[in-house]
Structure formats: structure tokens, C-alpha cells
Amino acid sequence: MIYATGDLHRNPLRFQSQYFPEQAEMTKNDYMIVCGDAGLVWHGDKSGDPQLDRLEALPFTILFVDGNHENFDALSEYPVEQWHGGKVHKICLHVIHLTRGQAFELQGRMFFTMGGAQSHDIADGILDMESSDFYGQYDSLCRNRGQFRINHISWWQEELPSDEECAEARQTLDRLDWKVDYIITHCAPTAIQQKVNADFKPDKLTDFLEEIRCRSRFHYWLFGHYHDNRIIDEKYVLLYEQMVRVL
């Protein structure tokens, strides 16, 4: 069995048995895919995290692509390993980060992954703790309820993929003749994002995903980011707190 869900934001309450009774029939060979913003290594501590211990104790394996609200400094500390045909970071034995531009064969189906998204809650800017006027800016923005984040504390430029990651994604899809069963991302391709919320502006990543949407053949595209549960044009599945069966 394979299930998918949307943003966790470090709150995996939905995986408790009263909310997800289907897990009674699952094993570690079954998967729950989180479509970004999992936040499971937010504090960067590789050991002694009771939440990771609780997730490891679940009967299924958790897979996640990264979103924009991730600690990319912490994720990069994990060694890159090969798993089911693609590159991963193993956070725990059964909590696994599926990296960008990869393809994984899971239960006889091919899954292409491309995490990341541009933050939309930074209208008032990104603060740098090394700046001489950081505390003045911080206090002012807090008093005025500003929308801001702090570099390497609550925001990372790695939220958007590098040119190298996009090139690797194209190479992966070239190898597969641009045909996969499922595409897992955090944000949506530009055309689909406009149908979700026309107020969101295209960016480097949504335009790249639009290229993938136009060139590839796939059954379903699952994504998160927009905090809603909807199906768009029959094959694009936007997930937030819902958990849906994929296989």
C-alpha cells in the first residue's frame, strides 16, 4: 500500500491510529508519502528526537519530498544514499527524504520527485542575524506583525532548486523517456498553480514544473503547499491534511 498526504509542518498528529486506522493493515514495506513541508529535521539534531522515535515506531515507512519550510542545513548533513533507484537522505531507517530530480520504483510503479517551493510569507523580507541592525528590524517587524523570516533560522535559499538539480531532473526523465506513473512535488506547475490560486505568481520552480508537465506522460501528479484538498483537471491532486491511497 502507498498513501500520500500534504504538509505536516512538524505535526504528524494525523498519523495516530484514530485518524488513520488503515495503518493496521500496513507494514514497513508500505509507504506514506508527504508532499513537502514535513519539517521532520527542523532543529538539526540527528539523535535524541522523540518525535523521530515516534515516527520510526509507526507500522509503515514515511517518505517525503522537501518543501520550502525545511531546515536545509540539517538535511544536507545526512549522507546521500541510493534507494529504490534514486538518491535519498535516510533520516531514520524508515523516515526517508526523497531528493530532487530522482525516480524511485515503489511497488512496481515509477515515482518522480522534485521538492522545493518559493515562500509566500516573506513580504517584509529576510533578516540576517549577522546584520548590525538585526534586533531593531526584528522588533519593528514583530510589533507590526510583519511577514518575514530569518536566514538559516526559518528560511533557506535552497528552498528553490539549483540549476544543477534541474539538470539532473531532466537527465532522470530523459532516461525514462519522460514517462512515469506518479509525480510528487511540493508546489504545482505554473498552469495548475493559477487554477489553485491566481494570486500566486509564477517563479523559477513552477515554470520548470510546467516544462515537466508539458513534456512528460504520467497518471497522477500529487502536491501540497497550498493548504487545501482538491483535484484539478482530474489528474492533479492537491493535498493538505487528507491522506489518500495511491496504490
Annotated model-derived regions:
Residues H43, D73, I122, Q193-Q194, ...:
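Generic domain-boundary/flexible-linker signal
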Residues T5, R10-L106, A198, P202-L209, ...:
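Core catalytic region of metal-dependent phosphoesterases/phosphodiesterases
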Residues I2-A4, M32-C35, Y182-H186, L222:
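Structural motif
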Residues M1-Y3, A103-T113, Y182, D233-V237:
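Beta-strand-turn-beta hairpins that frame and shape the catalytic cleft
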Residues E158-L247:
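Internal alpha/beta domain cores that form substrate/cofactor-binding pockets in large enzymes
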Residues L8-H9, A38-G39, N68-N71, A117-Q118, ...:
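Catalytic metal-binding/acid-base residues of hydrolase active sites
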Residues L93, Q107-D199:
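Active-site-proximal loop/helix segment associated with metal-binding centers of metalloenzymes
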Residues M1-L13, S132-F134, N144:
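Acidic, histidine-bearing metal-coordination/catalytic regions of metal-dependent phosphoesterases
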